[in-house]
């Protein structure tokens, strides 16, 4: 069975996007962080996005600018299979992308049961909320960024029941980011 990992960027005050829907604040690059991001993108995993995150990612990662600034990540993001959940997107131009329709939890349950590498959710807050509530996320990798936004959308917006998590490990970076690795408690 495939694992589903949510890799999410949040501000110190818990928002994954600011009040205008922007998350450019979450992209603090330095050599240490770039090496970490590159190693994450070098695996055989698959990616899962909602439409908004997909459109943001597809507008940058397949570009020459991305290849110049973070070549390992750009290559990995384009190489990996991508599953995009959308009710409105009719076509996906980024290579290795499959549009998925229907109930998100049911479709991810099906993807998890198929053979293949793990699946990472990047961004896609509403997808994370739905899958967390359905118990379909095996690990949360939460990157806490050293910034206070004051307002925005919380990552688990819409979750109606408590989800107990166990901290497995953490890693601090020189740029101020801290990655917290959580698993749901049984």
Q: Language-model segments: what does each one mean?
A:
Residues 1-186:
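Enzymes that bind and transform nitrogen-containing heteroaromatic metabolites
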């Amino acid at each position: 069975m495939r694992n589903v990992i949510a890799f999410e960027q949040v501000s110190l005050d818990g928002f994954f996007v600011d009040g205008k829907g922007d998350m450019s604040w979450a992209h603090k690059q330095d050599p240490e962080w770039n090496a970490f991001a590159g190693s994450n993108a070098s695996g055989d995993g698959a990616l899962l996005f909602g439409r908004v995150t997909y459109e943001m990612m597809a507008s940058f990662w397949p570009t020459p600018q991305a290849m110049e600034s973070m070549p390992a990540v750009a290559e990995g993001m384009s190489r990996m299979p991508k599953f995009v959940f959308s009710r409105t997107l009719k076509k996906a131009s980024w290579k290795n992308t499959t549009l998925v329709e229907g109930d998100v939890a049911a479709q991810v349950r099906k993807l998890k049961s198929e053979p293949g590498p793990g699946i990472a959710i990047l961004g896609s807050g509403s997808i994370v909320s739905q899958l967390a509530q359905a118990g379909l996320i095996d690990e949360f990798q939460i990157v806490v960024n050293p910034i206070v936004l004051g307002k925005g959308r919380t990552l688990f917006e819409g979750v109606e029941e408590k989800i107990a998590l166990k901290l497995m490990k953490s890693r601090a970076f020189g740029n101020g980011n801290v990655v917290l690795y959580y698993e749901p408690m049984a």
